[in-house]
């Protein structure tokens, strides 16, 4: 028996991540078996025939929880009345493109998306940004949705966290469930800091269990930071199914209270925690308690951790300053 309904916008819905994602939302994996789902699927005009094919497949699955599908290239229509906006689509970086070019192109997209969310979404809307560079895209969207509380904007480092947990579990020879409190700090980029010092394996320090600091500092950190590029090299295209899985997991973290002794990584607006500039979208260790998202406090860094933390923080400052100079922030 269902007792509530959620309307979800998915941008880039006919893309590889979108295709891997929407069926799992419709089946109840994101919001649970008691929540009916309406899907507002957004694509560019040329991709609408492909999107209609996705909608046909959704129909053919006969998901009991899926009550409505809207396929559109109209951004305002896509955001109409949505409770969740999953901003998956973005322009990928192409050869010869500077990072500032990427920020400018996507900045225009996420400016419009923020405005549409502000003007058309439900009063309780929450926004989960996946399209890269996701931290700064989230910052731009948030900046252009002034009527939406800033604590309802998130960007995804869930995939990075899951990658890191897997690497630690494999190295330690333990089940994936044994690895907890695996924090990704900072930017969803190659500067991110996967904090193995504060991670736990069966409740004990991961560094102590693995007892190979050289592997942790060099192989582990670089493997997590470069995993996306490694997948592209092996598969010929970027992570799609694993990214979709991480979106499911990430949103689930945000709608379900966190078990005792656990935490998860999430990019959210800084309120000055750990010395991060207020207003930056930064990945922190988080917990959801009684429906409220809180940053885990009082974690400590050694010199190695502090250096990595500062590197990713400085990159996010640089991205913010770049988009500000481009007129994409107030």
From Swiss-Prot:
InterPro entries, per the entry: L-lactate/malate_DH, Lactate/malate_DH_C, Lactate/malate_DH_N, Lactate_DH/Glyco_Ohase_4_C, Malate_DH_AS, Malate_DH_type2, NAD(P)-bd_dom_sf
CDD domains per record: MDH_chloroplast-like
GO biological processes: malate metabolic process; tricarboxylic acid cycle
Binding, NAD(+): 12-18, 106, 113, 130-132
PROSITE patterns for this protein: MDH
EC number: 1.1.1.37
Active-site residues, record numbering mapped to chain: 188
Protein residues bound to substrate: 93, 99, 132, 163
Catalytic activity of the protein: (S)-malate + NAD(+) = oxaloacetate + NADH + H(+)
An MF annotation (GO) of this entry: L-malate dehydrogenase (NAD+) activity
Keyword Oxidoreductase: yes
Keyword field: NAD, Oxidoreductase, Tricarboxylic acid cycle
PANTHER family: MALATE DEHYDROGENASE
Recorded family membership: Belongs to the LDH/MDH superfamily. MDH type 2 family.
Function statement: Catalyzes the reversible oxidation of malate to oxaloacetate.
Record protein name field: Malate dehydrogenase
Organism the protein comes from: Legionella pneumophila subsp. pneumophila (strain Philadelphia 1 / ATCC 33152 / DSM 7513)
């Amino acid at each position: 028996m269902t007792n509530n309904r959620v309307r979800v916008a998915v941008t880039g819905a006919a893309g590889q991540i979108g295709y891997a994602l929407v069926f799992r939302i419709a089946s109840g994996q994101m919001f649970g078996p008691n929540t009916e789902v309406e899907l507002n699927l957004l694509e560019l005009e040329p991709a609408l025939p492909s999107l209609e094919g996705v909608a046909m497949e959704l129909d053919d699955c006969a998901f009991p929880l899926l009550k409505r599908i809207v396929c559109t290239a109209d951004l305002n229509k896509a955001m109409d009345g949505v409770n969740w906006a999953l901003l998956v689509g973005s322009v990928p970086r192409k050869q010869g493109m500077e990072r500032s070019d990427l920020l400018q192109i996507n900045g225009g997209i996420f400016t419009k998306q923020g405005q549409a969310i502000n003007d058309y979404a439900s009063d309780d809307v929450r926004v989960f940004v996946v399209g890269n560079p996701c931290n700064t895209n989230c910052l731009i969207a948030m900046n252009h949705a002034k009527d939406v509380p800033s604590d309802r904007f998130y960007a995804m480092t869930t995939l990075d966290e899951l990658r890191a947990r897997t690497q630690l579990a494999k190295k330690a020879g333990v089940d994936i469930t044994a690895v907890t409190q695996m924090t990704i700090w900072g930017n969803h980029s190659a500067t991110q800091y996967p904090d193995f010092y504060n991670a736990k394996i069966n409740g004990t320090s991961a560094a102590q269990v693995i007892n190979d600091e050289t592997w942790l500092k060099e192989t582990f950190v670089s493997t997590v930071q470069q995993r996306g590029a490694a997948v592209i090299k092996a598969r010929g295209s970027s992570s799609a199914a694993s990214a979709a899985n991480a979106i499911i997991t990430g949103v689930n973290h945000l709608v379900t209270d966190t078990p005792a002794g656990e935490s998860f990584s999430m990019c959210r607006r800084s309120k000055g925690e750990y010395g991060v500039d207020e207003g930056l979208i930064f990945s922190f260790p988080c917990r959801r308690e009684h429906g409220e998202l809180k940053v885990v406090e009082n974690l400590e860094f050694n010199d190695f951790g502090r250096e990595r933390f500062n590197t990713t923080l400085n990159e996010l400052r640089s991205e913010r300053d770049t988009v500000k100079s481009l007129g994409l922030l107030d």
